[in-house]
């Protein structure tokens, strides 16, 4: 359940970033001068017939933001029920989405470009957080890679940080024209991320996440979009369909940046969670989960072994529970196994 809700919230946030880009690049950020109301109307009751021009982009952005907020609350409730460190993720998501809504409103009221930069940067950080949550609540999170070693763990974390800083520099280009730093950040991204993907392929072999290959394609696309955005805004080069093209290119550039950030965050989390002890458990106990391993205790330790330890090979916990005791007469059924958060 939590995994599906995380995916829906992630997709809604992606659409929210899309409309945020449209608001910025069409100059519609101040099309609606008041907040939290819309021309005096309640946010949810503003007439659709009056949503034209910049008002359409700005008010749609607010409505989608409200939807993301509600989805985040639902996701947080699901994560909270899972307990453990999932509760910290739930708390972080709620704090981030509330802060993001307040920043967006203050941007309208105070007319500060600094708030716009922080608002855009936090939106991408929130997308990265949701990407991590979607991964951690999936079955893929239970499949460890081959031990990547400390250097690759540090490198994947560095890649995620560098990509995020480059996104912040992109916001500075949009609102303050800081182009030189953004080009320098692009060089850093293209220096680090391809190395990460190459190292993952070499160290993990067939276990390498497909996302590592997807990252290279996203980087190539991002380079083309970045060059196109630069030519349209900072040069006199003629571009076909200039008005439409110069709206599409920067918006697409921002969206692909979100995907790159999400991918690098997921890779960083995946690699960081893959440690030698976890890999050893996976190799010596095929088919068992980490929870089963922990519950069994060491051989000869005197601790009682859980049901999972005496389970027939290939039979999952869900199947054990559904079969009943031998000779009990209860019908045997074999439901599909699920992780607690799915």
Please annotate each region the language model reported.
Residues 4-6, 83-94, 151-157, 206-215:
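Membrane-interfacial loop-to-transmembrane alpha-helix junctions, especially the N-terminal start
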Residues 12-13, 95-97, 151-171, 218-219:
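Alpha-helical transmembrane segments of multi-pass integral membrane proteins
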Residues 24-59, 241-242:
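Extracytosolic (periplasmic/ER-lumenal) interhelical loops and adjacent juxtamembrane/interface segments
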Residues 2-29:
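N-terminal signal-anchor transmembrane alpha helix
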Residues 68-74, 123-139, 185-197, 254-270:
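Hydrophobic cores of alpha-helical transmembrane segments in multi-pass inner/ER membrane proteins
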Residues 23-32, 98-121, 172-181, 226-258:
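Interfacial helix-loop-helix junctions of multi-pass membrane proteins
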Residues 49-71, 175-179:
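Individual transmembrane alpha-helix segments
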Residues 289-310, 314-337:
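Long, intrinsically disordered low-complexity tandem-repeat segments
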């Amino acid at each position: 359940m939590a995994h599906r809700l995380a995916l829906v919230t992630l997709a809604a946030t992606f659409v929210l970033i899309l409309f945020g880009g449209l608001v910025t690049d069409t100059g519609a950020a101040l099309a609606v001068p008041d907040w939290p109301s819309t021309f005096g109307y309640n946010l949810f009751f503003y007439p659709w017939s009056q949503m034209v021009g910049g008002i359409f982009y700005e008010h749609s952005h607010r409505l989608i933001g409200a939807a993301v907020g509600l989805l985040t609350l639902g996701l947080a409730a699901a994560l909270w029920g899972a307990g453990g460190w999932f509760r910290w993720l739930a708390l972080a998501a709620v704090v981030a989405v509330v802060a993001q809504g307040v920043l967006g409103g203050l941007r309208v009221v105070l007319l500060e470009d600094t708030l716009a930069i922080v608002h855009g940067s936090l939106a991408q950080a929130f997308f990265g957080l949701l990407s991590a949550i979607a991964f951690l609540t999936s079955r893929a999170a239970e499949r460890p890679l081959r031990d990547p070693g400390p250097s690759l763990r540090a490198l994947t974390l560095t890649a995620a940080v560098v990509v995020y800083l480059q996104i912040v520099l992109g916001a500075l280009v949009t609102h303050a024209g800081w182009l030189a730093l953004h080009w320098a950040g692009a060089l850093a991204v293209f220096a680090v991320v391809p190395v990460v993907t190459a190292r993952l392929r070499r160290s993990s072999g067939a276990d390498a996440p497909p996302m590592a290959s997807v990252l290279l394609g996203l980087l190539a696309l991002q380079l083309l979009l970045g060059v196109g955005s630069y030519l349209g805004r900072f040069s006199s080069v003629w571009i076909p369909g200039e008005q439409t093209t110069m709206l599409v290119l920067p918006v697409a550039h921002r969206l692909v940046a979100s995907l790159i950030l999400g991918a690098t965050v997921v890779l960083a989390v995946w690699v960081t969670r893959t440690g030698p002890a976890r890999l050893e458990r996976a190799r010596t106990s095929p088919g068992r989960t980490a929870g089963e391993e922990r519950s069994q205790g060491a051989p000869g330790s005197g601790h009682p072994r859980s049901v999972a330890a005496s389970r027939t090979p290939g039979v999952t916990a869900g199947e054990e529970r559904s079969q009943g005791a031998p000779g009990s007469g209860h019908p045997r059924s074999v439901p599909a196994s699920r992780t607690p958060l799915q």
